[in-house]
Amino acid sequence: MNFITLEPEQFRKFADKYPDKSFYQTPEIANLRAENGWTPYYFGVEENGKIKAASMVVAKPAFLGKSIYYAPGGPLIDYEDEDLTTFFFKNLKNYAKSHNGYLLHIEPYYEKIARDRDGEPVEGGFNHEKALQNLRKLGFTELSHPDEPKYSFALELKDQTEEKIFADMKRNTRNHIRKAEKMGVKVRELKREELGIFKQITESTSTRRNFTDKPLSYYETMYDLFHPRGEVKFVVAEAQLEESISKHCAEPEEKASKDTLSRSIIADGAITERPSPVTTGARERSEKDVSLIPLSVGMFMTYGDEVIYLFSGSDEKYMKDYNAQYLIQWHMIKYALEKGFKRYNFYGIQGLPDKSSKDYGIYDFKKGFTSTETGRVIELLGAHELPVSSIFYNLHQLLSKLKHH
């Protein structure tokens, strides 16, 4: 076996044929990282004229002039092949050490164990414990806070149809989709010049839910890098005011009284009725001559065998009445089926399902689109790091502990 450097297109050719891969292991992400001060490299293992393993790695000075070497979503290698992993990582470590590195950080897009949609191990399913053992033998330790989610939730699409998937959804999920359609909500793809719409909604969502949103420049760069290859989609769910109001008001009187009026209990115990956000919000926007409301947005990667639900946001004022976030998911699930993708990845969940967790609702939302047959929790190997220079690594660890005490 030979440890070699690759040209970006050589790496892409290998990655395109690799079965389990992440869009993070692409020249496009390398270019994105390069804009933020990282230097990209491409390494591989060649034997008898064939590449057996490869990785895009980026490096950046991070501590006292020493660099961290990072393989996001990689490397692309059979982690259960002890000889191959030993050869690759020893050579990669030596390269990093001779090029001013002190730490190697990897986040393999490689599953640890087969789990069902409730997060329970599948009887007779795969278990890649040997992959973890091989990493430990090489000196890797797992990190408790990976850059990308260790756990995600997916809908398997193999041998599925629109009709079957829809019928197998949770009843509430189906009802939310039907209601959004009845309210006249439409989903379309955003053009690059419309990404400000996407950013406006994700920013308000991040403020409401207390997380840091990406800058508009990030979304624009991702569009520029991946859209020419058909590997990213920014979508918006919208409703036209006149259409949605007329549909809403055309419902039977009894149902309309429940759906268009919400009740609030005031201090003396009396109940007063107030207009729903559907009519109130619509009236407010009508006064501003706005006829089309952006309700919800989503960013999806369409790479390899899966569609990945990466980022999203919704206008809080219209979430409950329009259910646009449900229609976006259904729109993209149908797209994934039409284009022959094998998996629809709802992406991150906070660990294995736990009803006591404050984030359980996120998992439950995603689970609602699946059945026991099609839904499953994905558990990856997780993020791992390997000291390249023991002296600088230990010094960095010591200073980090002192900083947090």
Protein language model annotation of sequence segments:
Residues Y18, L32, E47, E111, ...:
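Active-site/acyl-donor-binding loops of N-acyltransferases
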Residues Y70:
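Catalytic phosphate/metal-binding cores of nucleic-acid and nucleotide-processing enzymes, i.e., regions
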Residues F3-N48, K52-G65, Y110-I113, D118, ...:
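A conserved beta-strand-loop-helix scaffold within acyl/acetyltransferase catalytic domains
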Residues D81-T85, P121, G125, F166, ...:
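Flexible, glycine- and charge-enriched loops at secondary-structure boundaries
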Residues Y102-E107, R188-L190, R343-F346:
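A structural signal for short, well-ordered beta-strand segments and their strand-loop junctions
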Residues F87-K90, N94, E231-H248, E254-G269, ...:
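Aromatic (often tryptophan-rich) hydrophobic motifs at membrane interfaces
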